[in-house]
């Protein structure tokens, strides 16, 4: 896809507004065969006013249905430190959905979780939830704040999941805070082609970017060891001015940059429309696309096949870290800065 009105003469410049339109509408709906025609026109998408999502409404209903005893276990002040935590395999409260909530409440939780995802992708998410942990009943839920009284957020956690529903309570923060998703398909140690892993398509798209790089660019983009997985610290953002390793997107050719747009589209594909658009706006808010750098990591290459299992996109306002060895872990944090 090309932006006919924003070429700088060298074919490198991609207009910021066009970037949002391309990825939010075309980058997910048109360049990804898994989800054709998912969105309306870009003008409608970007102009649409914020509306209370069904998941937010259900989260409020869930809160109001809690007994006093239940609230003591799963309801917290909005500024409680648990709300900002993220990890790859953890229980935000010591009680699980299946053992603690009534059948009606369990049904609401399932519907809230479904509503956080693209309806064209949610069955894949539930497939990995079932394979990884035996279903949503094994996960845990916490509620922060009170609906109707200001900021309010629903958080669901468990193996390979930290998901949030916040209704824009956290200004300038995509998804309501850092999130995690992942999948161990068929075994803990996946094969090089990651058979039936529902998120491996994202790495395949990222490797298309690497294949499009010239030799000099590859030397800059291909690094040794990736960041360590350390819970919330994994997605700590760099300060503006700190060095971000990898190949800056601003130094890529136009065709390469368009491939990065497709990567972003595929990364956002699993999520509901409101979160996709919010994430793109937050990425773009302070020079986002030009601020991104992309890196690949050779020291965690399953099968030594030079199809890079571990890679990331990073800027001062974003970390999207895909660690595909020994199976897929994906860490995400997108936050604008004042």
Region roles according to the model:
Residues 15-31:
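N-terminal export leaders
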């Amino acid at each position: 896809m090309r932006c006919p009105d924003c070429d700088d003469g060298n074919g490198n410049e991609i207009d910021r507004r066009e970037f949002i339109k391309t990825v939010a509408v075309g980058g997910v709906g048109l360049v990804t065969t898994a989800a054709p025609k998912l969105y309306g026109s870009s003008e409608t998408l970007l102009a649409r006013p914020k509306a209370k999502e069904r998941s937010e409404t259900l989260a409020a209903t869930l809160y109001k249905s809690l007994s006093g005893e239940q609230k003591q276990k799963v309801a917290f002040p909005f500024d409680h430190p648990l709300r900002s935590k993220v990890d790859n395999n953890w229980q935000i409260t010591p009680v699980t959905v299946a053992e603690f909530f009534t059948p009606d409440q369990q049904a609401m939780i399932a519907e809230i979780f479904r509503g956080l995802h693209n309806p064209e992708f949610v069955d894949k998410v539930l497939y990995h939830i079932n394979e990884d942990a035996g279903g949503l009943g094994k996960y845990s839920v916490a509620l922060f704040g009170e609906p109707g009284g200001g900021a309010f957020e629903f958080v669901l956690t468990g193996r390979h999941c930290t998901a949030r529903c916040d209704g824009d309570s956290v200004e300038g923060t995509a998804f309501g805070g850092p999130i995690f998703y992942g999948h161990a398909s068929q075994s803990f140690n996946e094969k090089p082609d990651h058979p039936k892993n529902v998120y491996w398509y994202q790495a395949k798209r990222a490797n298309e970017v690497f294949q499009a790089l010239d030799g000099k660019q590859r030397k800059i983009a291909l690094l040794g060891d990736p960041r360590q997985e350390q819970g919330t610290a994994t997605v700590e953002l760099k300060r503006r001015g700190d060095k971000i390793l990898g190949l800056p997107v601003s130094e890529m050719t136009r065709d390469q940059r368009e491939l990065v747009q497709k990567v972003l589209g595929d990364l956002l594909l699993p999520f509901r429309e409101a979160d996709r658009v919010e994430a793109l706006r937050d990425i773009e808010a302070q020079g986002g696309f030009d601020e991104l750098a992309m890196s690949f990591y050779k020291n965690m290459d399953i099968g030594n096949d030079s199809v890079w299992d571990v890679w990331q996109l990073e800027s001062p306002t974003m970390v999207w870290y895909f660690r595909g060895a020994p199976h897929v872990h994906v860490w995400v944090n997108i936050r604008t800065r004042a």
